[in-house]
């Protein structure tokens, strides 16, 4: 990560973030927590199952991301899904079966799926 030393650096960083965000518009973003506790709880298996389900159903416009701790250790593995034009939704306790269900029910149909973790923060966009 580059060091921000001036207001111009900050403006350039903001534009870089906005450009990355614009490239994602219209895509479904699936962000899987792969911190140590999530990996130990089966996070990699959940991510692989979701990737397999996306491929099996021929879905396009789905981007996978990996993140570190989402601070929901009690609910690992956790997955944050952002559907186009919607706020992100975080799901907890995502095992292989739940991962596949998230793709077929939530990603493909927009249907709510059990395991939503209530939002306890507000996003700040620079």
UniProtKB/Swiss-Prot annotation:
Do the record's keywords include Ubl conjugation? no
Activity regulation reads: Inhibited by oxygen.
The signal sequence is none
> Which CDD domains does its entry note?
TRX_Fd_family
Superkingdom: Bacteria
Relate the assembly described in the record.
Answer: Heterotetramer composed of HndA, HndB, HndC and HndD subunits. HndA and HndB could form a heterodimeric intermediate in the electron transfer between the active site of hydrogenase subunit HndD and the NADP reduction site of the reducing subunit HndC.
Question: What's the protein here called?
Answer: NADP-reducing hydrogenase subunit HndB
- Species the sequence originates in: Solidesulfovibrio fructosivorans (Desulfovibrio fructosivorans)
């Amino acid at each position: 990560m580059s060091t921000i030393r001036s207001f111009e650096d900050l403006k350039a960083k903001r534009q870089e973030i906005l450009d990355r965000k614009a490239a994602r518009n219209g895509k479904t973003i699936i962000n899987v927590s792969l911190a140590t506790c999530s990996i130990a709880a089966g996070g990699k298996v959940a991510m692989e199952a979701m990737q397999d389900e996306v491929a099996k159903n021929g879905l396009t416009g789905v981007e996978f991301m990996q993140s570190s701790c989402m601070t929901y250790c009690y609910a690992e593995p956790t997955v944050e899904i952002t559907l186009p034009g919607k706020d992100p939704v975080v799901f907890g306790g995502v095992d292989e079966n739940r991962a596949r269900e998230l793709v077929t029910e939530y990603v493909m149909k927009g249907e709510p799926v059990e395991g939503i973790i209530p939002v306890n923060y507000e996003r700040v966009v620079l």
